[in-house]
Amino acid sequence: MAAENEASQESALGAYSPVDYMSITSFPRLPEDEPAPAVPLRGRKDEDAFLGDPDTDPDSFLKSARLQRLPSSSSEMGSQDGSPLRETRKDPFSAAASECSCRQDGLTVIVTACLTFATGVTVALIMQIYFGDPQIFHQGAVVTDAARCTSLGIEVLSKQGSSVDAAVAAALCLGIVAPHSSGLGGGGVMLVHDIRRNKSHLIDFRESAPGALREEALQRSWETKPGLLVGVPGMVKGLHEAHQLYGRLPWSQVLAFAAAVAQDGFNVTHDLAQALAEQPPPNASDRFRETFLPMGHPPLPGSLLRRPDLAAVLEVLGTYGPAAFYAGGNLTLEMVAEAQHAGGVITEEDFSNYSALLEKPVCGVYRGHLVLSPRPPHTGPALISALNILEGFNLTSLVSREQALHWVAETLKIALALASRLGDPIYDSTITESMDDMLSKVEAAYFRGQINDSQAAPVPLLPIYELNGAPTAAQVLIMGPDDFIVAMVSSLNRPFGSGLITPSGILLNSQMLDFSWPNRTANHPAPSLENSVQPGKRPLSFLLPTVVRPAEGLCGTYLALGANGAARGLSGLTQVLLNVLTLNRNLSDSLARGRLHPDLQTNLLQVDSEFTEEEIEFLEARGHHVEKVDVLSWVHGSRRTNNFIIGVKDPRSPDAAGATIL
């Protein structure tokens, strides 16, 4: 019976018995071969030498050996007396088909499980990327007009503050370190962009005219009564509004960062020392001299200056919020009294009626990018109009720089003339229509057709109205790990504003100078009706924080830019955007290259010190009246390309700093 079972097993396997691969690797004796003589044992060295012999390659051996059916170790026992050919009693194809089917079913289960798992993991990762908090603190940039304030912004980000938290702290810091440019007694505008959701908010805290201010009073006495120049400050309301929307750290903690700078002291910057030496307010008060000229003369750059008075103000604001500034408390009374004592008409009611505006920025498409900038009374539409006009020129690396400069100069003449028509749209509905025209590609094509490629226009193509703007301004640019971009520009108007300083140390602005009125000075263009003085109105502004992002998708170039210099700032921003988005230059090179600005009031084309004599001669040959100046404006910037972020200051600024978090 055992023999029959063995025979039956062998018959079932037949010629399809499995191959014993161990038999192959051990090189068994073939059935027809004679027994080989015993092979002596080799040592380890001899074995290594044998394996290294090229003639003992196993593949060569297998090819040369006369392999018949190699009996497996399991079948050799029952094959001593049997025929090598036996009847197959089981259909091998049926068995194979059944086995294959089972294998396919198992494979299907495995593949399905893997795909399901991979899909689940992918969906989870995508949701984490879009909706989860950053897992690692990395990648960000801060740029401001003072190195101390840049480092403060980085410090806030390092403590898990939001991009807006960092911007608020840095802006308040600039009011301490750069009091000639910005401060609690001024105003500004902030543009916040959420990269993930592609949403933007413009927080406009531009100063507004007091309710009792009249044009006639300014015409008569603006030079002798600095109190008339004071608008209702918007800085505190605007920063608080931004923090309410996007802040992460407590308001009091954010203000405490800046208060520490005022309390501990800071090194006087080159720009502040120069402003105190060359541009002190006319008829500076004793309080101003005590604060900024404690030794009777301007401090030297690098000397230590403390502002415990502002530290105390920030502590009060951190505890009680904007109400301490606007609701009739001691701070309000001090500001009203200081302005009225100098001939002003501002009242407590003006402060209580003030509110920051939350708006959408204007938007244009340029070279595959969205360009976001402030809406009127700011001149963002004129900036986008300039880009729309330039987009139609063949501006490539093959075009000479001189030819490109001519096109830029003629384009900016048009854009600045358009800007002179803007004002507060709440008081004039035609301004909204003008804004829509400036954003139109069709209008841009028309203006482009009016530009002569080889000759400057002998007369302006458009009527020109009076253009005024804050010559000094402070910039804060943030790209944080939270995927928010913040661009902010603030100002007091003239250096140190009106020159009026309260007992608490708050410098008051002179923003009413940005309105237009008749007979202001000799040789001024016609006053702009759109920018005339009215109670509660906000004057025309060249504060232009600007953000750029890809028009489609998330990947590509993002920019945050700001500028000072009033109308010169608009010219500077246009040329930097041209360098980055059209000529594909890096941000550092784009900020460093020479810039120009057409002064519409004098009909002079101003160029900065980076221009060569050859470039100036080319422009003069085209009919431009060129005036070379040292610096036109400072344009700072931050750039993000995919996951790489960098903050860059304008090299013309001796004190600004950009810092990048890696």
From Swiss-Prot:
Q: Which Gene Ontology terms describe the biological processes this protein takes part in?
A: glutathione biosynthetic process; glutathione catabolic process; negative regulation of response to oxidative stress
Compartment list: Membrane
Has the keyword Cell inner membrane been applied to this entry?
no
Which residues lie toward the Extracellular compartment?
128-662
Part of which pathway?
A: Sulfur metabolism; glutathione metabolism
Query: Where, in residue ranges, is this chain on the Cytoplasmic side?
Result: 1-106
Report what the protein is called. Answer: Glutathione hydrolase 7
